[in-house]
């Protein structure tokens, strides 16, 4: 792993390169400015080398020639100053705390937390450094992981080796916000299953699915945090394990899968370390709703609109997704993971998952 002090110095050097650029611009009689990629669906392109979606060539120049742009650059200067101080003092803060700290910055204070969050993303893009290296973290923690995986966690009190099955309770090991502090030591796994809901995650653990099939189980906790996606990315890359995603059968859950496999518009600048392009979708598939006659609900207008939007989303531009989404629109139904319980509490682990994983070529027994 990279030396902590070297990483700190590298982060500071990249961060301070921004105000140095402004100083050079003003020394030449120019207005200070920054150039950023436009963060829209139209500027997302597929990178064949990395197999993830990234920002394209469309850029936006923000120059201090208007009050709005000048204020943005002023706020960025304050945030850089704050992060510099935080790194030097080996302190950390949440994104929420940063927003409240800005209350004392007079004209540079943020009107809403979303504004400060977006500015941090700007700094990530400009420096090619993750916010975790700025010692900034979100309010929410990463989710949980359970199964045959041994890790080493670096903390303020030193390092500690943890087995994510033997050394934790049935809630699993809680993924920290900064996954770079983890070293993956060894495993006895044949697959990774990322699970949307806590109920299904607990069902697989209670039924011993992790032991029977040597599976690492990861609770996504809904739309997964960056730390959770980073863990999946590392498990796929470092151990070359097949990663699968098991969600509810609705358009919002398909987007959870897409964020794991291909990345999102919001984090397209770090798709290479967050996305897992080899990740495959288990279900709940629209065809499962039909074939297993699962208890279901009618699609809402918002569901229908979201499904139609996904038909034009480049992340779903495959024959498989086109067929499944059109089938769901035809069925006009959606189902939850827990709907399999209608066939018994063991059905999902004894019948559905083994059959589905075998058909995908993930399970070979």
Describe every region a protein language model picked out:
Residues 1-242, 251-365:
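Nucleic-acid enzyme cleavage-core boundary/entry regions
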Residues 248:
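Glycine-rich phosphate-binding loop
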